[in-house]
Amino acid sequence: METTLTLYVRYLAKPGCRESFLRQLTTEGIIDAIRREDGCLWYDYFLSVQNADEILLVEQWESEEKQQVHLRTAHMDRLRELKAQYVADARLGKVRLD
C-alpha cells in the first residue's frame, strides 16, 4: 500500500487581502482544477474566526509522487503568482500515512 500525503498550509494573507485571494482562486478555477488532478483525495481551505487574515489549506494526495506532479502544473504556477500578490507568509506541515 502506498503512503498517502497530507499537507497543512497556514497562509497569512497581507492585511485585508484574504477574501480577494480566495475569490481569485475560485473565479480562475484553480481550486477546481486541483481537485480534478490525478491523485488528489482532498483539497479545501478553512478560515480562522480569530484572525481575519489567516487561511488554513488542507490537502491529501494518494502519494508524494502525485503531489510533486501537481506542483508542476500551470494552475500551480498561477497560484504562486497570486500568493506573491496576496500572501505575506505561508507555513507548511506534512503527514505521511501508510
Describe the predicted segments one by one.
Residues 1-5, 41-53, 78-98:
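Glycine-rich beta-strand-turn "strand-cap" elements at beta-sheet edges
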Residues 2-8, 14, 23-27:
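N-terminal/domain-start segments enriched in small and hydrophobic, helix-friendly residues
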Residues 4-12, 42-71:
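Short, well-ordered beta-strand segments in beta-rich or mixed alpha/beta enzyme
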Residues 14-16, 97:
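Generic structural motif
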Residues 17-41, 75-78:
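Short amphipathic alpha-helical segments
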Residues 25, 70-71, 80-83:
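Short, flexible helix/strand-to-coil boundary loops that buttress conserved ligand/catalytic motifs
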